[in-house]
Amino acid sequence: MINKRKQFVLGLAGACVMGLAGTPAVSADLAEIQKNGVLRVAVANEIPYGYMDVNGEAKGVGPDVAKHIAEALGIKKIEWTTTNFGSLIPGLKANRYDMVAAEMAILPQRCEQVLFSEPNSSYGEGLLVAKGNPKDIHDYESFAQSDHKIAIMAGADQLEMLQALKVPESRIVTISNNADAISTVSTGRADGYAATSLTVGELASKSDKVEAAQNFKDPVVNGTPVRSWGGFTFDKDSTALRDAVNTELAKFKKTPTWEKILTGYGFSAEDAKGSFTKTTAELCAK
């Protein structure tokens, strides 16, 4: 996740924050969004899930699919915001944007705070290590059985995985964004960085000081290999918008264009098929 901390709608976000100072946040409803012709969408600058390119254009699986959905809903304009991953949900709850297109993993604890669409993607885990993998680490479980330290991004669901694997807190290094992962691992502050396989691959391609751990073994939690399902995220009051997105998403996922978007960003055909294997209701259930 490469976080450039760049805000592309400063005026809009600032106005929202000022308006929130004295009154509770009230999410825009679908009818209002369609009337105004503007959908406010946030990403966390995580390649390939949702990010802004050097030209200021929204890219990634989430944004590309969101553009098709917005068009289908008759919404002519999307105003994009970038923020840290850990700020995505608070920003939704504060009405700084209407929707998040970051392929955020659908998890029970998140479902208590926000609404999710049905899954748009599925993806597995990976591990970023120093070049040559000097500590010979190939799984998350190793960090529970040694003195090695593992880094994670603040707000990411890898924390729950590591806790389930009994990795002590003293061995977990929290960083603010994916951009810091390369230096964190290459300088030895941590011996590995836990993230999705796609994120790890993207980071490894940016520096010859790190690499993706080969022969990585997916973490097994409660007897089940870990796989995540990502979707669009909404405030709890945005039921109509969520439902409308679900309707259009279901239609779009039946087209070859949808799968082409996923595979174009490095998802496998199996990842695309995997998005159909779970419902949001199942993923939100404890």
For every predicted segment, state its role.
Residues A28-E103, E112, G264:
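Extracytoplasmic small-molecule ligand-binding "clamshell" domains
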Residues M52-V54, A66-K76, A144, A156-S176, ...:
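Ligand-binding cleft/hinge of the Venus flytrap
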Residues P63-A72, N133, E141, A156, ...:
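Extended ligand-binding regions for polar small-molecule ligands
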Residues I78-P90, K135, I172-T187:
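Short helix-initiation/N-cap motifs at beta->coil->alpha
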Residues S87, E103-E112, M161-A164, D191-V226, ...:
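A ligand-binding cleft/hinge motif common to bilobed small-molecule-binding domains
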Residues S122-G126, S207-N246, A269-K286:
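Periplasmic-binding protein-like
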Residues K131-K149:
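Flexible hinge/capping segments at coil-to-helix
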Residues D157-I172, A213, N246-K286:
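Ligand-binding clefts/hinges and TM-proximal coupling segments of bilobed small-molecule sensing domains
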